[in-house]
Amino acid sequence: MSILSRVSDRRPDLSLVSEEDFPYEQDIVRNPGSTKPWLAYIEYKLQKGTVQEQAYIMERACVQLPRSYKLWKMYLRFRTKHVSKLNAAIFASEYQKVNSLFERALILLNKMPRIWEMYLKFLMQQPLVTHTRRTFDRALRALPITQHNRIWALYRPFANSAEGETAVKIWRRYMQVHPEDAEDFIELLVAVGLYTEAVHKYIEILNNPRFTSKNSKGHYELWSEMVDLLVEHATAVETGHETGIDVERIIRSGIERFADQRGKLWCGLATYWIRRGSFERARDVFEEGITTVMTVRDFTLVFDSYTEFEESIISALMEMASTRAEKGEVDEVADFDLDIRMMRFEHLMDRRPFLLNDVLLRQNPNNVTEWEKRVALWGDNKEEVVKTYLDAIEAIQPKKAVGALHQLWTNYAKFYEAGGDLSSARRIMEKAVKVPYKSVAELADMWIEWAEMELRNECFDEAMKVMAKAVQAPKRSTVDYFDETLSPQQRVHKSWKLWSFYVDLVESVSSLDETRKVYERIFELRIATPQTVVNYANLLEEHKYFEESFKIYERGLDLFSYPVAFELWNLYLTKAVDRKISIERLRDLFEQAVEDCPPKFAKVIYLMYGNLEEERGLARHAMRIYERATRAVADEDRADMFNFYITKSASNFGLPSTRPIYERAIAALPDAEARDMCLKFADMEKRLGEIDRARAIYGHASQFCDPRTNPGFWTKWDQFEVQHGNEDTYKEMLRIKRSVQAQYNTDVNFIASQALARSQQKRMEEEAAGNGGGEMDAEVADAMAQLERQARAPVGFVAASEGPKGGSMPVQPVEVHNPDAIDLDEMDE
């Protein structure tokens, strides 16, 4: 270290130059202004020389060529590396020598940022805060502004490590050139307790529309951080005209702007005043908050904070009162203040349901349900109840009402009715029926409520007058009930609900003639419903006006078409048949009923018609009607109709009479139903002993029955031939069976249906036996392969007997059982 000291003294030390160095020394002498020989000399010494020799050569080089950046950089790096392992506090003198070396270099190289960076990094290793800060400032002054970022990259960490006032001053300078890092500066200001300046910085960046947070914070988030700072350090932040900080104004501006954060901001403003000791102002803020917030969430937040604030004050006052009691002191003013605060707190808790209701009504003053709840909250307080009803009526816009507005008016009138003031209730009802409700139905309900009120008070004449006024309309009204451009008052006279109540009222308290007039008026206005027709007809029937009753049904049938007309015809025909009017007239009615009747509804009417002919007419006429019915009914009812027709024909004219019916049924019905009909037909012929006819029917039905999917049919035919046939007929049956099977095998659709039937049958058998699914899949695959082989086989001559021909093995068809098949033998038994 002493040698390095001598080197720094710039005195030549020839002992550090050896004979081997002469070539380099001579080269230096020959080229005194060039750095190349010096660099070669230094390179040589770095490989062969000692540390002292290396330092000596570098020192000489920098003295001879003081403007060489390369030589100085090499020398400075060499010296800083040499002392870097030493403790800067203990070896401060050694560090100071290197500092002096940097100062020498900067005399001529003060525009070199790399030299400054090396010097500043070296200084930051030493406990020289002031000197380091001044050196940073010198670097900023010496270098052009385009290179300041390199210095600030070191200056900022130094400032943060220095902390305190030093850091703040450095950051203030940094903010002048890099305002985008304001958030970091604010963190520093908060950390050192300069809250007022931090708030000013927040205000500055919030007022700058070009500011973009490097932490991706939005405008609200920054503003919220500022508010939290103001509230948390309420006493430390300087406010007033001098500082330009008005906390209440700032927070209130946020309450107006950020609607979804009002509860939090009201609590924040109140907390601010609490921390500043202004309890009354805090209470005023809480009161304003709970009476202005728009959501239940915000209300709950503010109200809970309010109650917590009051409880804390009361708790503190009670502790003080307890302390006074222990000491035996009496302070009437303090005790009175405690009593007042407790009463105020109880009043606040009592107000909670009303305040909550206010919140919901502020959200939507047209909410009828909430107004009803408010009325219920007042209970027996009649003055407040009336005031609430008046406020509701004034606040609610009828066209925007949510809920049953007419019910609010009704309850208002009932309030006076319950108090015995019927005249006031009537005045309310008179006003209520003039309100432009959203729908005619509400107005109709209002009129009905008025009439019911009169009925409850046994004022029947008044009720009649009310309803007569409600349905009052021009003689020939052309108003469209569904025309929304007209007011409900202009359309209410066509309200079916209103007329229905009116007719019930007239029917119960007035004469038949008056009731008929009301019904006739309903028909004139063309608002009658099927129920109106039925009620009117029943009324006349009860009073023995049977023919008039029938006329009403006919008028109803003129008004309504099917399907409504079906119900009216059903009632009308039933009443007419029960009345036992002339058979000719009944026939005319039934003919009218079935004339335009859709197939869907024809079955019932035809059955009634046929039953009439059976009971009061001729059986032959009934059969003709049933025959017509088989053509008129819907497809899904046709098979049932044929079966009914066959049953009636057999009971009236014997089994042979059913043959043409069976034949027409087989021709008219689809294949599946025709097959069942053939089986019944064949069974009937068998019972009559017509074996050949039965066999012919089986032969005809065979074309509908694939042996693989309909084995039940072939089983029955087989049993039939066994019982009644011979070898020839049995062979013929087998021939037909093979022929049909071959026919179906050529149809891809039938092949698919056969495979499906087989798979379903196998699945059912395996489920019954508890077998696994693997065997079922194998058998289904085998069945499908067999079907494919049969489908590919050529269709040729069909032999009359079964058996192996030409050495080929017969294919045994897999028998499929139909779980839905009907055993006709059991049915016959």
Swiss-Prot record:
One Gene Ontology biological process: generation of catalytic spliceosome for first transesterification step
GO cellular component annotations of the record: post-mRNA release spliceosomal complex; Prp19 complex; U2-type catalytic step 2 spliceosome
Compartment annotation: Nucleus
Purpose of the protein: Involved in pre-mRNA splicing and cell cycle progression.
Oligomeric form and interacting partners: Associated with the spliceosome.
Gene designation: msp-41
Protein name: Pre-mRNA-splicing factor syf1
Main location group: nucleus
Intervals holding HAT repeats: 15-47, 49-81, 93-125, 127-161, 163-182, 277-312, 380-418, 420-456, 473-505, 544-578, 581-615, 689-723
Nucleotide-binding as UniProt keyword: no
Keywords: mRNA processing, mRNA splicing, Nucleus, Repeat, Spliceosome
Family stated for the protein in its record: Belongs to the crooked-neck family.
Region (Disordered): 799-829
Signal peptide: none
